[in-house]
Curated annotation (Swiss-Prot):
Gene3D superfamilies membership: alpha/beta hydrolase (3.40.50.1820)
Protein name per Swiss-Prot or TrEMBL: Pimeloyl-[acyl-carrier protein] methyl ester esterase
Record key words, sorted: Biotin biosynthesis, Cytoplasm, Hydrolase, Serine esterase
Superkingdom of origin: Bacteria
Swiss-Prot/TrEMBL GO biological process terms: biotin biosynthetic process
Pfam families according to UniProt: Abhydrolase_1 (PF00561)
Domain AB hydrolase-1: 16-242
GO MF, any single term: pimelyl-[acyl-carrier protein] methyl ester esterase activity
Gene source species: Pectobacterium carotovorum subsp. carotovorum (strain PC1)
Family of this protein: Belongs to the AB hydrolase superfamily. Carboxylesterase BioH family.
Length: 255
């Protein structure tokens, strides 16, 4: 039976689970592990089908959340980046008693642009799916480049993301397509409006995938959560601005 890659480290007493985004793996957190480890017991996970968690096919958001939750500590703070933010949010909705606090990073409850809602145009996501079957590696690289666009360290950050992908086993086209399906179809705006778990949303001011307007719209709609927009950061603020990012995480965890 397929099992998740799950690594635990750190000197703190508080469990913090880190969930990566589409196409990547837990290696993406390496630049902030040393900053977080004194404060938390860190759990870094490769999502099903990604990195070292091989043997899983494409799956729904709720199935992915259930598989991750099955290996998780009894109670934890959950931090999810991008697609991982949807997984962490789904876990908070389906098992709130196991979630002390929720942090989403450069994530949206609805990644697809809709009337009155900023996001990625659905045909762009469909285009990525089409290109995946034609040129798998180039498509993943293009997506990674989009994530760092606009930051002062864009090239360096994109190189780091690419090395994270290439150092571990690559997800299959089926798994990547399944992840894009989730990004295209998921809409947790209404369910998360009633979430009773303490909830912090972190954004990059220059993010081209999750526009900063999302932060303001959700501030109005979700009175139960707070948002912080990190200036000059794009879709991977923990890579471009690790100090500002970890300060926010530690302050929220200790509040």
């Amino acid at each position: 039976m397929a099992t998740l890659y799950w690594q635990t480290e750190g000197a703190g007493n508080t469990d913090l689970v880190l969930l990566h985004g589409w196409g990547l793996n837990a290696q993406v957190w390496q630049s902030i592990i040393a900053r977080l480890a004194p404060h938390f017991r860190l759990h870094v996970v490769d999502l099903p089908g990604y990195g070292r968690s091989q043997g899983f096919g494409a799956m729904s958001l709720s199935d992915m959340a259930n598989i991750v939750l099955a290996q998780a500590p009894e109670r934890a703070i959950w931090l999810g980046w991008s697609l991982g933010g949807l997984v962490a949010s789904q876990i908070a909705l389906s098992a709130p008693e196991r979630v002390d606090k929720l942090i989403t990073v450069a994530s949206s409850p609805c990644f697809s642009a809709q009337d009155g809602w900023p996001g990625i145009k659905p045909d762009v996501l469909q285009g990525f799916q089409q290109q995946l079957s034609e040129d798998f590696q180039r498509t993943v690289e293009r997506f990674l480049a989009l994530q760092t666009l606009g930051t002062e360290s864009a090239r360096q950050d994109a190189r780091l993301l690419k090395s994270v992908v290439l150092e571990q086993p690559m997800p299959s086209v089926e798994v990547l397509n399944g992840g894009l399906d989730i990004l295209r179809e998921a809409d947790l705006r209404q369910p998360l409006a009633d979430l009773a778990v303490p909830f912090l949303r972190l954004y990059g001011a220059l993010d081209g995938l999750v526009p900063r307007k999302v932060a303001g719209l959700l501030d109005e709609q979700w009175l139960n959560s707070t948002s912080v927009v990190i200036p000059k950061a794009a879709h991977a603020p923990f890579i471009s601005h690790p100090d500002a990012f970890t300060e926010q995480v530690i302050a929220f965890a200790q509040a």
